[in-house]
Amino acid sequence: MGLVVGGALIALAVAPDVVRAQDAPKSPVRPRSTYEDLQMFTQVLNQIRVNHPDSIDTHDLLMAAIEGMVRAADPHSYVIPAMRLDPAKEEQLRSGKLHPVPVSFVFIGGAPVVASVAPGTAATRLDILPGDELIAVDGASVRAESAEELEISLSGPKQSAVVLTLERRRQDGTIVRLDRRVVRERPDPASAVPVAMMIDSAGTAYVRITTFAAERVADDLHDALDRLEKRGLKRLVLDLRDNGGGSVKEAADVAGEFLPKGAIVYTAEGRKKEVTDTGRVSRSFWRSERRYPIVVMTNSGTASASEIVAGALQDHDRALIVGHPTFGKSLLMRGFPLADGSAIVLVIGHVKTPCGRVLQRQYRSITTHEYYRLARADRDTAGRPACVTSGGRRVFGGGGIYPDVLLGEERTAPVWLARLVEQDVVLSWVGGYVSASSQSLGSLDAFLRAPAVPAAAVADFRTFAATQGVVVPADAESDAVLQRMLAEGVARARWGDAGGYSVEALVDQEVRAAVRALDRAGTLSGAGSAR
């Protein structure tokens, strides 16, 4: 046995009582009992305590073992150690005296990772993406060990700011670190349904739902559809892209707008009997089922409660799913108090669609980065289990919702575009342009009739970008991308999320593909009977 130092092999003396690896007892063929495993655990702990040359706190070793045990179960369960939370600060946050950072995190493999950005907040314009790993807060390392602890520690006075240092792994494998100055604020509940508009003369309506975390999502959708129906709504594009989910109840109520009373929306299953549940449409007597053709748009950012909606409408042949495979995250979680005042937040069940598809995708034996990267790359039906809808169509499971109409791969932003966003070049230019052009911009309705910025403004932006070290290619494709980005940015800066999403609906090629699929959606058999 030896060490290689500077290319030379230096022999090490081995004490007679040290057991060599090759001399160690062979692992028994029979399965080990839990008692034997616990014995081994105790022996390993004692060997470290007695023989390791460093002074290692036994408590730290045990906490690391517990964290590793929970992490081995799944990437979403976690332990909240006792005395980690600040009760006074938590109460101030819950009562509204303090405001949160409008970015939610999950802990995967012990690391805080962005789950979603609250719609209707300034943070949506900061290029913060799901899967970005939080490295530091105001230059200091992250000390929080749970999502709750992190939320409380990041809270502060209204409109105060905090700098989040994020690490992003791009599609090409390169890693970039980004500093984002995020203002603390609470999202506007109305931002859950920021856009509900007619988009053509054929009676096509476009509605976008950005979250199910608000309290009135289903009611806001109901009111929006009532208004659109009075304007001639005959068919609907329901956009759930980048909707990270939220309340299962709100999701069930949204699906219930389009399904008959009593129809199954989801089923929940776990080891304990009390976890088992069947979510069905429960609708007030004065609300009727809406029967027009529907296309639901999804992508890899569609997760959790939004997957429940998409899956229910697909399984009942009530809507055609157009876009990209969804993220594949839908777990039931519950907190359990422990004797010392700490707690474990544990996955206790899985959610299935009406025909039995498990929404949660595989998470074992992969890294945090792979967990998010694979959500964007999973486009193949090979090996995916299938089930049959109410009307006899085959739909695919295996994690997430697989679309009926699969669009081209979600395009990776070219380097120049990624740099424009990451370096806040677009945000800086748009602010100045809107301030100088507030009179000429007019109303949102007027802007939407021709959603574009003048050629002179595009040329001015190119010059400004060059001064920031970003050269925008001079070709037709880049020009088109730049024009769409600037038009959307101007509308969002001038009229908020409603403006930005409205422009996107009119210029987005994926929305146009969804509109083309509406004729096919009209041939579906419709909602099946409750099962």
Model segments located where?
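Acidic, polar loop-rich interaction surfaces within structured domains
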Residues: 300-303, 311, 315-322, 327-401
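Signal peptide processing junction and immediate N-terminal pro/mature segment
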Residues: 11-26
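Cleft-lining beta-strand/loop regions that shape enzyme active-site pockets
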Residues: 22, 26-27, 32-37, 46-58, ...
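Sec-exported extracytoplasmic/periplasmic mature domains
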Residues: 45-54, 65-78, 136-139, 155, ...
